[in-house]
Amino acid sequence: MDRKVRVVQYGTGKMSVYTMRYVYEKGAEIVGAFDVNPNVIGKDIGEVMGIEHKGVVVQDAKDARRVLEELKPDICIVTTMSLIADVEEPLMLCAELGINAITTCEEAFFPGNSNPILTHRLDEMARKNNCTITGSGYQDIYWGQLISSIAGSTHKITKIKGSSSYNVEDYGIALAKAHGAGLSLEDFDKEVASVDRMSDEDRLKIIERGEYTPSYMWNVNGWLAQKLGLTVISQSQKCVPQTHDTDLFSSTLNMNIKAGDATGMSAVVTTETKEEIVIESECIGKVYAEDEYDKNEWSIIGEPDTTIVVSRPCTVELTCASIVNRIPDVMNAEAGYVPTAQMPDLEYRNKPLNEYVK
């Protein structure tokens, strides 16, 4: 492509500060921005980023259709919510208008195994209008490509086991309570674990209705299976309490969590495949003890066994850089809803983004 890639930013919160700056620094340009927050609408995106004005004002998301029809951008970056149903509006709008889109929405990483109906609708609309929709972010490398690359150096695999942890203290009281922090193990079982205790048949019915709420790893396991050419025969999810052997004080909950009570939870997803490789991954959210920190740990078990650990990852920056570096792959991909498992491996971009677009 012999001109700059034209990008629209949908959602101008914390993530957009990085995605927009990275877009400019990779030789592309932001031509439009949208939000629903009245405190942001009307501001120049430079003000949002904390830099000089760029001459692009954040507009009300309700005007997105009209503005996108006028702007005709190459791609839209959507950085708003975590469930595919919550980003349906901007993604479907892009699909209808023939605009490529990439989102940080965690479920969008591989939504076909958690909301197949909506994924199919987005896929059909994008195919009809010759554009590509996908999801990317931190998991593209650290829960995905990193593991598939290690698999490439392994003779025989029997199991892939992964975990990623985060401190619920960093995300507010609603998330801490949703993770069962502060509950006795008995109450945790009643209020948290029992919600996801169902048969495979019942879970499948909920998925087929588009009403399932997956943990982040649910979609990651599906992505890994596709990337590695595995055939999924069953997948289950359970919530397991996390505990500590001494009392912990939670500033978010403003309470002392007794030793042995739940400090949070792990959502464990187990995938069995026809090829007899088991993928077991977990997302651990809990109140940290003083010596604990964010950690991403994956093991490939077989011949040989290999474990890789990423300590204290800069998740926000890595997420946003992955999104921006993926832009040429999205623009070069076939039309439809295309998971990044079906795209080339994510690469560092040392030239302007347009030079990678075919």
Spans of model-derived segments:
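Active-site-lining helix/loop region of Rossmann-like oxidoreductase modules
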Residues: 6, 10, 14, 152-286, ...
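Rossmann-fold NAD(P)-binding glycine/threonine-rich loop
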Residues: 106-130
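Short, ordered loop/turn segments at secondary-structure junctions
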Residues: 36, 81, 105-109, 138-139, ...
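Conserved active-site and cofactor/substrate-binding residues in soluble primary-metabolism enzymes
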Residues: 10, 14, 18, 71, ...
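C-terminal helical cap and adjacent loop that interface with cofactors, partners, or active-site loops
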Residues: 286-358
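N-terminal glycine-/serine-/threonine-rich beta1-alpha1-beta2 phosphate-ribose binding loop
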Residues: 1-96
